[in-house]
Amino acid sequence: MNVLQLMQQHDTMPETYKRLSVEEMEKRVARVKRELGTRLFIPGHHYQKDEVIQFADATGDSLQLAQVAAKNKEAEYIVFCGVHFMAETADILTSDEQIVILPDMRAGCSMADMAEIEQVERAWPILQQLFGDTILPLTYVNSTAAIKAFVGVHGGATVTSSNAKKMVAWAFTQKERIFFLPDQHLGRNTAYDLGVPLEQMAVWDPITNTLQYEGDVQQIKVILWKGHCSVHENFTVKHIEHIRKTKPDMKIIVHPECSWEVVQQADDAGSTKYIIETIANAPAGSKWAIGTEMNLVNRIIQQHPDKEIVSLNPYMCPCLTMNRIDLPHLLWALESLLEGKVVNRITVPKDVAEGAMLALERMLARA
């Protein structure tokens, strides 16, 4: 079941919230936060809008928010300002007594939806027949709980863009090959950084149920699921060439969800956290073109007026699904709690959560 199907089963915000002024909504969110105190915890991903992130009790990338969720034993309600797979991860890592809420069920992730459990279960026996028991599955945290559970049960782990290199290196100590899903670009960029040549990487197409590779399949070390981030695929080599031509003294830093060609042409690449820290530590007057989500790029620009910062793609839009979480939905979810009503609760079935926990724990133990 994908996010679009799930959202049909959940509550819809009353239209009255859309007619409120920003000032009124901010005042009411602050009031609910005061009233609920430590019973409420709001984690917010870096890609969230400023109107939402201002109320976050903790901000971070996927790894940081997973760690924060795992450590929080106090909050009764966790209102997650991110996307569906992040809220699922929070539900898995927190106690049964803690309630995880996603303010808008439309906040999904197109990348996570590119790997459905039925597709993975069809692919696995074919790959086993080709390679035997030589494959360890790894999944980017940008995946459904069901995918995480599959990976956990088969001895694998989750990864984030912050620790992908460490986790892929670990995986190669366990098995001869890795099966990386759902983001082919992060998998390819990480394996290449670790010395695996492109000639030893293949792509699994879940639509045609085939392995895309020319040559002797026994040479394959990395099997990449044919998935991608719809935001980061919009950065191209042409954008880099334009910056090199018009601003030759500007450094280019991109997220590893970008294509291999873009990452190779950039000056630097790294996780959201890495990008934030790199810009923060750069000298005043330095010039940067950033290849990642637009809400974050705009926030970095505001935080560093002493530096010249632009988006690598000047026509970039924010992540549309992240943008579903807005001030009206946050206020509605919070005020519903004061009324004794829980809306849009995220609950991962116990059997799925147990398998996913195995994958997450293997990652967190090495984070």
UniProtKB/Swiss-Prot annotation:
The Swiss-Prot or TrEMBL record lists the needed cofactor(s) as:
[4Fe-4S] cluster
Q: Specify which residues bind [4Fe-4S] cluster according to the UniProt entry for this protein.
A: C109, C229, C319
- Check the record and name the Pfam families matching this protein: NadA
Which reactions is this enzyme annotated as catalysing? iminosuccinate + dihydroxyacetone phosphate = quinolinate + phosphate + 2 H2O + H(+)
Recorded GO molecular functions are: 4 iron, 4 sulfur cluster binding; metal ion binding; quinolinate synthetase A activity
User: Which UniProt key words apply to this protein?
Assistant: 4Fe-4S, Cytoplasm, Iron, Iron-sulfur, Metal-binding, Pyridine nucleotide biosynthesis, Transferase
Q: Which domain of life is it from?
A: Bacteria
Briefly state the protein's biological role: Catalyzes the condensation of iminoaspartate with dihydroxyacetone phosphate to form quinolinate.
Quote the pathway field.
Answer: Cofactor biosynthesis; NAD(+) biosynthesis; quinolinate from iminoaspartate: step 1/1
Residues in a coiled coil are: none
Q: Where in the cell is it found?
A: Cytoplasm
Q: What is its EC number?
A: 2.5.1.72
Q: Please give the Gene3D superfamilies that the UniProt record associates with this protein.
A: NadA-like (3.40.50.10800)
InterPro entries listed in its UniProt record: NadA (IPR003473), NadA_sf (IPR036094), Quinolinate_synth_A_type3 (IPR023515)
Similarity remark? Belongs to the quinolinate synthase family. Type 3 subfamily.
Q: Which GO terms describe its biological process?
A: 'de novo' NAD biosynthetic process from L-aspartate
Q: What is this protein called?
A: Quinolinate synthase
Where on this chain does iminosuccinate bind?
A: H45, S62, Y140, V141, N142, S161, H255, P256, E257, T272
Q: How is the cofactor bound?
A: Binds 1 [4Fe-4S] cluster per subunit.
The keyword 4Fe-4S appears for this protein:
yes
Q: What species does this protein belong to?
A: Anoxybacillus flavithermus (strain DSM 21510 / WK1)
- List GO terms (cellular component aspect): cytosol
